[in-house]
């Protein structure tokens, strides 16, 4: 059955208007994004195939070319899907940053777990804070295995000094999923902590994240 053949109250747009967005299934939301199906199948079947494809793949790695491999998805539909995903990601990140609390390492993890927790390479970030411990910005410092040649104090503190940060929190992911700090993690953290003392920008913590968990190196007394 095609959308136009449905009872009006069951059509995705009308259902959203009557019952609210929380009443919508993933497939129904995708129907609104896609708008139309293809000659061989209606938008409801196409939407289910798209949702199944996204669930089977890491949505963070999706691109226009990848989505266009799905039968019935051209450039217009692919870009609409990615735009919807990106808006959701940005709003989620903004909410996590707004709810950040210095006393809660989990609030740092909430910012980064979805973004880098499942990445297959290490991403090293500095979270810059002002004198009231509010987030100024998050800065990507490096990608690749953490060591002292890649994570240089100059790169870590350059943005912090330029943006007037009072303190920083270091964050990086472990592609293996293990949260145990490596010797390189500990050495780099201790070095950056000392440099922070010298330049007057305190390193408050170093958080290691996976896709669904985190570890505070400060609480673990690794530095």
Curated annotation (Swiss-Prot):
<dbReference type="InterPro" id="IPR046778">
    <property type="entry name" value="UPF0758_N"/>
</dbReference>
<dbReference type="Pfam" id="PF04002">
    <property type="entry name" value="RadC"/>
</dbReference>
<feature type="domain" description="MPN">
    <location>
        <begin position="101"/>
        <end position="223"/>
    </location>
</feature>
<feature type="short sequence motif" description="JAMM motif">
    <location>
        <begin position="172"/>
        <end position="185"/>
    </location>
</feature>
<keyword id="KW-0378">Hydrolase</keyword>
<feature type="binding site">
    <location>
        <position position="172"/>
    </location>
    <ligand>
        <name>Zn(2+)</name>
    </ligand>
</feature>
<dbReference type="GO" id="GO:0008237">
    <property type="term" value="F:metallopeptidase activity"/>
</dbReference>
<keyword id="KW-0645">Protease</keyword>
<protein>
    <recommendedName>
        <fullName>UPF0758 protein FMG_0357</fullName>
    </recommendedName>
</protein>
<feature type="binding site">
    <location>
        <position position="185"/>
    </location>
    <ligand>
        <name>Zn(2+)</name>
    </ligand>
</feature>
<dbReference type="InterPro" id="IPR037518">
    <property type="entry name" value="MPN"/>
</dbReference>
<dbReference type="InterPro" id="IPR020891">
    <property type="entry name" value="UPF0758_CS"/>
</dbReference>
<dbReference type="GO" id="GO:0046872">
    <property type="term" value="F:metal ion binding"/>
</dbReference>
<dbReference type="InterPro" id="IPR001405">
    <property type="entry name" value="UPF0758"/>
</dbReference>
<keyword id="KW-0482">Metalloprotease</keyword>
<dbReference type="InterPro" id="IPR025657">
    <property type="entry name" value="RadC_JAB"/>
</dbReference>
<keyword id="KW-0479">Metal-binding</keyword>
<dbReference type="Pfam" id="PF20582">
    <property type="entry name" value="UPF0758_N"/>
</dbReference>
<comment type="similarity">
    <text>Belongs to the UPF0758 family.</text>
</comment>
<feature type="binding site">
    <location>
        <position position="174"/>
    </location>
    <ligand>
        <name>Zn(2+)</name>
    </ligand>
</feature>
<keyword id="KW-0862">Zinc</keyword>
<dbReference type="GO" id="GO:0006508">
    <property type="term" value="P:proteolysis"/>
</dbReference>
């Amino acid at each position: 059955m095609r959308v136009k053949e449905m009872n009006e109250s069951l059509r995705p747009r009308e259902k959203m208007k009557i019952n609210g967005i929380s009443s919508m299934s993933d497939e129904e939301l995708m129907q609104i994004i896609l708008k139309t199906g293809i000659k061989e199948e209606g938008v409801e079947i196409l939407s289910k195939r798209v949702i199944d494809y996204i669930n089977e793949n890491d949505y963070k790695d999706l691109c226009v070319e990848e989505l266009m491999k799905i039968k019935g998805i051209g450039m217009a539909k692919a870009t609409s899907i990615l735009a919807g995903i990106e808006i959701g990601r940005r709003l989620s990140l903004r909410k996590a940053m707004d709810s950040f609390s210095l006393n809660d390492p989990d609030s740092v993890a909430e910012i980064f777990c979805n973004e880098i927790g499942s990445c297959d390479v290490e991403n090293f970030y500095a979270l810059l804070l002002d004198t009231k411990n509010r987030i100024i910005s998050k800065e990507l410092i490096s990608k690749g295995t953490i060591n002292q040649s890649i994570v240089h104090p100059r790169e870590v503190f350059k943005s912090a000094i330029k943006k007037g940060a009072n303190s920083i929190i270091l964050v990086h992911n472990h592609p293996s999923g293990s949260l145990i700090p490596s010797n390189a993690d500990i050495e780099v953290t201790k070095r950056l902590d000392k440099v922070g003392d010298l330049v007057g920008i305190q390193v408050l913590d170093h958080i290691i994240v996976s896709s669904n968990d985190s570890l505070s190196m400060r609480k673990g007394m690794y530095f």
